[in-house]
Amino acid sequence: MEEVKKYGKTLEEIEGGLMFDDFPESLVDSDEDHNIFDDEFDAANDETFGGGLDNIGENAELENYATQTAKLRFDDPVWQKPSSSDHVAPSASEIPIPFPNFGNGDASDSFKSSFEAESPFLKKSIWGNGTDGAYNIWGTNFGISSVPAAPTLDLDFGALLPTPTIQATKEVKSSQIPSMPSSALTLEDCERMQMGNKPDSLVDAFKDLQLGSTPVQPQSAQFSKHPLEARIAAPGTPATASSQALPTLPTAALSLEELELQIMKEAQILKGRQQVPSDMREDNKFSHPPPGFNQNVQPRMDPSLSPGGMHGMPPSMGTSMPHMGPMMPPQNMQLPRLPPLNPQFLPLIPVWFNAIINNIQLPMGVPPPPPFLFQLLNHYRNPQLVHAMIMQSSIPPNIRQNGPQFSHPSGPHSPGNRVQRKHSGMPSTRTIYDLALDSFAGYMSYKEREWLIRIQFIQCKGSGDPQVDDYYYVTWRDKQIANGWTAETKLEEATKEKKEKSSESQKDYLERISRMNYREMQKERARERDKERQRERQERIDRGEDKKLRQTLSDKFATSLGLPSKSSTHNPRHVLDMKAQVESVDNQTKKLSDEERKIAVAKKLRTMLLRLEGALNILMEVDELRRSSLPEKSQFKDLSSDEKDQEVEKRTTVIINELMGDDLSKLMQMSKGRAVITRTLKVVEPRDQARIILALMTAGGLVSKKMYGEIVLDILPVVYQKVSNLHPDQFKYLVGALNLDTLKRQLLDSNMFIRDMMMTLFFVSVKNNQQLVEWAKATKFSSLKMPSSAPLSIWRKALSVISDSEIKEFADDIKYSGIVDCHDVAQLIEQSL
């Protein structure tokens, strides 16, 4: 019992000594920034593949561990006294989690210890000790070291796992644990005694097993022991003679190679299921745990995704778990509290992070990043975590979203893609996207802009020499002084203006006041107009010109619903008017508003244009039918000449019936409509040509006078060509079909189109020896001179194919024809030359 008290230790001291006493000195003495995960280890050695298991019994410290802990007694009073050992057990929070990938499923396990750690920054105020305002976040006294510059900020964003902080334990005097009595109980025996179970014979047999002579270990023996015992007692178990007789292995047992193969296959299948897309990995720049934040915890894997054969597998068995995304705190987890930040600065936090991390220039109008952001990033090394802490501390819970949300800006306008968006020949990488913040974006670089601003500042300051700074004004002023002008001070000008105002009359004063008050002036004008209207109305009433019939109340409200009216037995009050009233189209058009009228006109114009497009397509088919040789792909290639003529007649008849009716006047006022008319005249037969000419002369009276010139220039040349080619009988039929009354009325209305058409018919009749002139003389046809005496310059321009000599002969024939106003008409013809 005395021997047990002499070497008595607590369980924490024993576990701490086993975990930290033999820690490699090279790692203890190394720098904290050294990342042991970056070291390369050679796997092709005897240690990895079990080549040194034969000499494992040489370690006396582990060899005697079973005998040292054989007779431990928890009811002994020595466990209640402080330990006299020099070994100090570390805190439980500093012990690494054995298997972090197979936890209890609680997502907050990985974050509790880090958030509960003491931080020197959290004890300070982000507003500073020397600040005067509540929102001065750019103070200088923070109680911590000075703020580092943005380029030197050491944010380890490239490492997969954080740099672990290795804590060196106390230097031990001896690397060996003193031997314990052989009768001491082991940890396993103590557990069995507490549970009320007896020691297992299989475990006793396993203790005496010689590990060096056994290539394969039964699977049941691997998992029958406690993990701590399997890790501590197995390597140091001494070999005995009785251990050579091994128990027979079951037929379904797996060898070490087969077990390793099975584990690797399952890991590959799991890795394929959980493969993260490449675009997601590129967009999330902060997808790893922050250094100093949950240092000894690997990414937690969802237990539901792990295969059945991998439960309880330690990380050292050769399989590497796939990366399961960023280590971010759960949504409802309470983060460390910071002093609240002004809400107006919350939208600027991502902009400041981008400027600090990417070392880019801040947009115009954005203040510089406050110093506390540098300190938070230096402490936590995770922009996502810092952003979540600030947002949780600054936004009330009732309006805050669940969990911190922070997404790094990405896309074509992100800072990382500005180099890719630079256009060739442009001095800047910024485009029109940045014009809202910088009017010089895309035209000059930042340095060029600074240089331009400096030059402008220098120009604004001036050199002090008026001849250099403002040469033109100085020259002009010298000339004015030379001409007798004297400069007056502002005080003298104000005094002079005041005198002018004081000397103004009452009328001038009222005019000036009325100009100053525009509303009063408008009201006064309205009152004057009302007085003028009343005066004119009274004058008309006095003259008897404006006597309105007095309308009784009954007549006014008759046939009105719900309004009083005089009723009797013979004339009852009309509650509802049952008479059918059909308003005309003109009345409906008048009721339309200006906007509705515009919409209606636009619809009609669109319909007319669609009809013209259809007519042009038909004319193109007619031109194709008129060709002597048709292409191979033509749909009319197999038709005979008679069939082609029939197809042409069908199509021209459709155009004449559809367009040469009531809508012809509208077509004549449209350039595309006139093109359809002229093309139709060129392809139809003479009989149809006469029909079209008669329709044109009938619709000419409905055309606006402003369009006469354009209509004559477009239509008259084709009409002259086709009328000249008519047979005398056909020409006689055309003249006989004219409506004389309509023509006379249109000539009296100074219709230039009808005058020019009749002048063309007279010219063709004289040229072809027709009797039209004699017919006009006999019928006393209206004069072509017209009351307005409009010149024939447009008619002559339209008939430019006729020579001047022919025009002179035509003028002489008209002069001696004996028609009405023959001399005046001949004079007009000669003036057109």
Swiss-Prot record:
It is found in: Cytoplasm, P-body. GO terms for cellular component: P-body. Residues 279-313, 398-427, 492-549 are annotated as: Disordered. Residues 303-313 have a biased composition (Low complexity). InterPro entries: Pat1-like. One of its GO terms (molecular function) is RNA binding. Residues 398-408 have a biased composition (Polar residues). It comes from the Eukaryota. GO terms for biological process: deadenylation-dependent decapping of nuclear-transcribed mRNA; determination of adult lifespan; P-body assembly. Disruption phenotype: RNAi-mediated knockdown reduces the number of cgh-1-positive foci in somatic blastomeres. Its main location: cytoplasm. Keywords: Cytoplasm, RNA-binding. RNA-binding protein involved in deadenylation-dependent decapping of mRNAs, leading to the degradation of mRNAs. Acts as a scaffold protein that connects deadenylation and decapping machinery. Required for the recruitment of P-body components such as cgh-1 in somatic blastomeres. May play a role in recruiting the decapping enzyme dcap-1 to cytoplasmic puncta in the cell body of the posterior touch receptor neuron, PLM. Belongs to the PAT1 family. This is Protein PAT1 homolog 1. It comes from Caenorhabditis elegans. The gene is patr-1.
